[in-house]
């Protein structure tokens, strides 16, 4: 559950931000979030539905001055759910399923907004060891 993940080149990444309602804390959403993530992992993983891997992040309150262009550098409490899929179509099929929709509805009760955006993977890398040649983009 807390081990490293491997993302194949060409994977589709979905970035979902869930803004928590005022007064809702991480402890309040933890069970609903865990149940929702388990449904995705166990029901749609691999050949069952195209789910590759996922990560959940809690906003720490940190906003980078160096990486932010806007004058106002603040953000509301939110959770980021990052999932990796073989295709956008497989993602959409999984989320149209009644079991997932019920779990997502329970999570949505505690949120004021949710936005899920899809991305194509363009680059990935890790620090190179001495003597190691740079990896080439697969053809």
Where are these regions (language model features)?
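Short S/T/G/P-rich N-terminal loop/turn motif that feeds into the first structured element of a domain
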Residues: 1-101, 110-139
